[in-house]
């Protein structure tokens, strides 16, 4: 299963709750629950962006540089999450910029595990 392979990435563990799958990092800093109609997507943030839903196993975001707000663009390819999360990033760009500058002034980790569940660290 793609989600299980994604969660096998170092530092992530698979959890189930109310028949919904999610990955929780061992060192969470920020977590948001986003609601869009009947759709609920959990976005976990620790220099990594991940959205998990019952319909889609695993979506991840590219690395983010704290000094480059343009890098907040997400790589979601599945409606309605693309619209939802892109809007959310635009709306909270200042918050994320401040947080990254305070906590992670260097290049953040890169987690790439779309569908296939492949993950790696940026060097």
Curated annotation (Swiss-Prot):
Protein name: Uncharacterized protein PM1121
Annotated source species: Pasteurella multocida (strain Pm70)
């Amino acid at each position: 299963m793609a989600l299980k392979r994604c969660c096998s990435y170092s530092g992530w563990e698979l959890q189930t709750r109310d028949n919904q799958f999610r990955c929780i990092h061992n060192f969470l800093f920020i977590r948001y629950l986003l609601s869009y109609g009947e759709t609920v997507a959990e976005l976990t943030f620790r220099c990594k962006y991940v959205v998990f839903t019952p319909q889609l196993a695993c979506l991840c975001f590219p690395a983010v540089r704290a000094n480059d707000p343009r890098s907040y663009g997400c790589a979601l390819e599945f409606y309605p999450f693309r619209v939802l999360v892109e809007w959310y990033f635009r709306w909270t760009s200042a918050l994320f910029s401040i947080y990254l500058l305070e906590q992670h002034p260097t290049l953040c980790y890169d987690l790439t595990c779309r569908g296939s569940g492949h993950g790696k660290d940026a060097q």
